[in-house]
Amino acid sequence: MAKTLTIIDFMQKFSSEESCKTYLADQKWGDGFVCRRCGCDHAVKGRTRHHRRCGSCRFDESATANTLFHKIKFPLPSAFAMVHLLTTTKKGMSSCELARQFGVHQETAWFFKRKVQLAMKACEEGQQLVENVEVDETFLGGREEGKRGRSKGSKSLVLVSVEVDYSDMTRRKAKLKRCRASVIENASGESLKQVLEASVEASAVVTTDGWKGYLSALTGKWHNVENSAQGANFEALHWHIFNLKNWVRGIHHHVSRDHLQSYLHEFNFRFNNRLKMGQQAIQVLATMAISPKSSYLQLMAA
């Protein structure tokens, strides 16, 4: 079992620019050096101990260059601390609060947080929900008078799937293991199928309400249909949806439709890695160290 990494341990480990750059260099070039200009795999000592110089074209590259830490506008220890807070605290932190705590502009904090969300997404990719899965849709966004049911109006429609454990428990108190939340255009069978095929293992037993879209989306799958009974038959799932909505309202107050999926990636990652005792921060840092840099426009489109 991995040792618990407390905030004190983390800050001592990454207390200086030197320690942060050493970690990033180890992650970035741990499997070998490849020059991103000419493709040569031979490196010599660079300008500093955290640089590598191509043995062929002599291009000098730093530990942060072409990573998600590329040209950040504040000290690396602060950036590492932000990653720890965003990954390990129960509800994360808004960009406004990050800006206040670390003394940076809100736009700077928001831009860096989007990079962290991108790494969180990468950490979760390819990890499908297995065994018993419950699925339902919900809306995230403002109210709109007269809109009911699956007519979303100006709201964003989100498909929420949870992997549940029924062992030694009544169905009402099923234990939630992992989750996925994805923005969908509508509740048609085609939209549902696209998301469910990507997020749920083909052999899983999927339980939904009687919405017709699920019937076509899950054709050929092990599919249970249950009446929602105003939430009584999906109590654990609906508590999870309730917590998701409270997180958006309470921490961020409002998330635009354009950026909602990135915040759902953050929510998914933090929930799915909640038992890693601080090690999830290291996982995200390692991913950021090997991920290519992203411009503002690229992050806006991600």
Question: Can you say where each PLM-predicted feature lies in the sequence?
Answer:
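Residue-level recognition of single "structural anchor" positions
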Residues: 1-302
